[in-house]
Structures are given as C-alpha cells and as structure tokens.
A protein has these predicted regions:
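Extracytosolic ligand-binding ectodomains
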Residues: 2-6, 12-375
Length: 375
C-alpha cells in the first residue's frame, strides 16, 4: 500500500509559501481506528487525483471525543506550520477547536452547516436535504406533509432547523424509538382504529343483502384492511437504519395507501438494506451524486481491498475545497478565504456558500428493480 508521506519537521521543506500543508484529525487508535485509517486513505486518493506534489497531509491521532488527545494532536499539527486542518469529525469537539482561532478547521460534521468562528462544516446538512425534499414534494403536488423524527437527544436540534426553514403545509410528529410503542403512536397518527371500524360498519351494510351489486361491494371490502384516507399526503422521515425500517413497517401495518401518500426520508448513503428490506415500494431521498459515490467507493476498494466509511468522501472533498482556495488565493490566511461567490463542484455534489452557510445541491433518488435511480 502507498501511504501519505508524514512530515514531522516543517524545516525540511523549502519555498514554504509554495507548499500547502493540511492537518488531519482522526481517531487512529482505539475502537474507531478503522474510521481514522479510512480517512487517511481517502486523502491519499484525493492527493493522487489532484496530482500536485506540493500538498502534504499531516495526520495526528485525535481519538474520539477525547479532549486531551484532540488538544495534543492540534498543538502538534500547529507546530508543523499548518494553517488549515480537516476535522474534527464530531460536532461535540467544536468547543475545543474554537480556542485555536489562528487555525481553520474543515469538519465533515453536518450538524451546523455554516462558518462558525474558525470552523466550516461541509457535511450533508439537514437544511440542504429538507430544502430539496420540500421542493420535490411540491413538484409532486402534495401539500399535507408530516415531518417525522424520533424523540431523542437530537429532537431539539431538528426542531430548531425546521423552525429556521419555516416550512409551510407541514406538521411535526415525534415518535418513540421503542418499536413496541412506535406502532401505537403511528396508529394514532393514521387514525387506524377509526378506519378499521369504518370498514367493519361498511361491510355490515352489505352482509345481509343478496343482490349482485351488494355482493360485489362486499367482496371488494373484504380485500381491504381499513376504509378512509389518512389526513396527510406525504411524509418526511428523519431517521436511519433499523429505526427507519420500523417506522416504514408501522406505516404499512396501519394501511397507509402508498399510491396516495408520498414516502420520503433523508440521506441514507445508498444503504441497500433500507431500500431492499422494507415493504415500501417507492421510497425517495436526497443524496450526493450516486455515480460519483460509487466511483469513489470502487476506486477505494481497488486500492485498499476494503470499502470506505461513508464520511470519508466528505474529507476527500474537503481536501479539494482547501486546494481550490489555496490555488485561487495563492495562500490561506483566514476562514474568509473560503467564502466563495461561485458554486464549487465536488465529489458529493455542488457546494454553495451563501450568507456564510454551506449548502449542497442534492439529487433525489429512488429504488427501481434493485437499482438506485435518480428521479
């Protein structure tokens, strides 16, 4: 394997102003070392694609939510004459890195997608996803949207994001992450009990009648599970993994008509299990460009014989963003050097930097015949 060259002494480099040194904060040891190594490998791929030998990566082990390790790693990177650092990978570590106001941090976190002090978050933000989803729902001529998300530590953050977006024709529905409780909550949302009763009452109207029309109507009703529509025509489910599968299963169980209700969720990084292991025929979600994502994964696998963690493509793009700023300005002095007026195209899609906010132009995807199709 070919690894990034580690430079431990900046004095070894001549013509310092012609060299771009980028730090990397990654968990290179401990339970998340696999992620850390994946980040290092992704930057190696980015370096090879850029093809400029004047760029050097200085990775350091920052642990995972380990303040002491993070602090030591930053100080070590800073001592090498580095101005811009890729990381930290979690939003919880932002408070510490803010103290290093003479450094610039490009984080793959998607929690706060904007310029915050000396940090730029370039993750696939909830704002970007919701903007794309609501526009998609509008184009499908749906106007009664339920935005669903679990009651957990992120609930308040999601509510704040939704409030800032001021989405119209929508209502919020928070649910339990416990599958046993969840089904009952969705029964209430979908008015399931009343729709079941309505069906039984309707069937009784025809049970004692023997005319052909009544017999046919009864046969039709026998094929149904409920009678009547739900009071929404679209859903946005802000959840992942097995929790998302449970929500989808509960919506199917409560007989939500998939021909009348549009099912959408947020970015799932093309997780095949989400789309192939649920009973929803058409599930839509916004994401980065699938072809670029697949090409990145295939190139990574060809080189390292394992597939990368999804977050690494964000770091891959972060290096490209740093390189662009460096080439455009001839140097990087402050976070303002990244306040581009024009849109920037990367692997994950197209970035725009408006009012110091970072937004991505995402595509809508669905599954069709076991394939991801751009809608």
């Amino acid at each position: 394997l070919i690894y990034i060259i580690f430079f431990f002494n900046s004095n070894l480099l001549s013509e310092e102003n012609k060299i771009l040194k980028v730090g990397l904060l990654a968990p290179l040891s401990g339970p998340y070392s696999k992620l850390g190594n994946s980040l290092v490998h992704s930057l190696q791929l980015a370096l090879e694609e850029i093809g400029n030998k004047e760029i050097f990566i200085i990775p350091r082990d920052s642990g995972f939510n380990n303040k002491n390790k993070l602090d030591i790693a930053i100080q070590d990177i800073k001592s090498q004459g580095v101005k811009v650092i890729i990381g930290p990978i979690t939003h919880e570590e932002f408070n510490l890195v803010k103290e290093y106001n003479d450094l610039i941090f490009i984080s793959p976190s998607n929690i706060n997608p904007k310029f915050t002090n000396n940090i730029i978050s370039v993750g696939v933000s909830l704002e970007s996803q919701l903007l794309v989803l609501t526009e998609f729902i509008k184009k499908q001529k749906k106007n009664k949207t339920v935005i669903m998300f679990p009651k957990n530590k992120y609930s308040k953050l999601i509510e704040e994001k939704l409030s800032n977006l001021d989405l119209k024709n929508s209502k919020i529905f928070k649910y339990s992450s416990n599958p046993e409780v969840l089904t009952g909550e969705i029964e209430i949302l979908t008015n399931y009990s009343q729709r079941k009763k309505s069906l039984e009452l309707r069937k009784k109207m025809f049970e004692d009648k023997e005319d052909e029309q009544s017999t046919k109507e009864l046969e039709r009703l026998e094929q149904l599970y409920t009678l009547g529509n739900v009071n929404f025509d679209s859903v946005i489910i802000i959840d992942f993994g097995n929790n998302l599968k449970s929500v989808l299963a509960s919506l199917v169980y409560t007989d939500v008509d998939q021909n009348k209700v549009l099912f959408t969720t947020i970015n799932q990084w093309f997780d095949k299990s989400i789309f192939y292991e649920n009973t929803i025929k058409n599930l839509y979600y916004p994401s980065i460009n699938y072809k670029a994502f697949k090409k990145y994964n295939d190139n990574y696998y060809e080189k390292y014989k394992v597939y990368p963690n999804e977050i690494t493509i964000l770091s891959y793009d972060a290096l490209g963003l740093i390189y662009y700023a460096w080439k455009k300005n001839g140097k990087i002095d402050s976070i303002n050097d990244f306040a581009f007026k024009n849109k920037i195209k990367g692997k994950i899609g197209t970035f725009s930097f408006k009012d110091r906010k970072v937004l991505q132009e995402l595509d809508i995807y669905k599954t069709d015949n076991n394939k991801f199709i751009k809608f």
